[in-house]
Design a protein with these regions (language model features):
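DNA polymerase processivity clamps
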Residues: 1-208
Length: 208
């Protein structure tokens, strides 16, 4: 629980005109933190319902988003990779390093993800500046050789999520998008917690 609240500010947007992104939302044994691009939740019985301002802790008069509608309906057959804590630690370092570079090289503010038989490939490139490729090794489920599964994510948002899940010290399941060509959201799941991350537009992937 402490890990969630310590990281929650990273997943909100306190500067947004949409006040629902300033609040933590409690509903049916779950607390949500969200922005326009990121949704993270924790399963726990908190004994309260409704929305509460993150800064003041006071009840917020905002409309609670319908979070259930944006969570991808994955099942046991869905393609996903399971990363253990030590691999998450390495991936977190890589993503934070890329995010630091992005402050000077805007072309690397996003990274491409590619699911393969060994795990998850993470890569980014800025012509004449930098090229980074990292293979996160994990247990792959649901993948077949004929699949070409790619996605594009905001580097800092992904780094923040991976950092959060690593701090929890459990395995993380990273699901492939259910509709690759539509760049549907990415789904992350661990014991008692999960997240949804919207993709960054990529003309080479999107075909709608």
């Amino acid at each position: 629980m402490v890990t969630f609240f310590k990281n929650a500010k990273k997943f909100l947007d306190l500067k947004s005109a949409h006040e629902e992104y300033h609040a933590l939302h409690y509903k049916e044994g779950r607390v949500y933190a969200s922005s326009a691009s990121v949704l993270v939740w924790l399963d726990e019985e908190f004994g309260k319902r409704g929305s509460y301002d993150f800064v003041t802790g006071e009840k917020a008069d905002v409309r609670m988003p319908e979070f259930e509608k944006v969570i991808p309906p994955v099942d046991a057959r869905a393609v996903h990779v399971v990363l253990e804590s030590d691999e998450l630690a390495k991936l977190c370092v890589v993503l934070k390093s890329i995010a630091a570079i992005a402050a000077k090289v805007p072309e690397v503010t996003s990274v491409r993800l590619h699911w393969d038989p060994m795990g998850l490939q993470v890569e980014t490139e800025a012509h004449n500046h930098v090229s980074v490729t990292y293979a996160a090794t994990g247990r792959v489920h649901g993948y077949t050789p004929d699949m070409d599964i790619r996605a594009c994510a905001h580097t800092k948002h992904l780094a923040d999520l991976i950092g959060y899940f690593h701090q929890r010290g459990t395995d993380l399941r990273i699901y492939a998008p259910l509709r690759v060509s539509n760049q549907s959201p990415l789904y992350f799941a661990a014991d008692g917690t999960g997240s949804v991350l919207g993709q960054v537009y990529d003309a080479e992937i999107r075909q709608d």
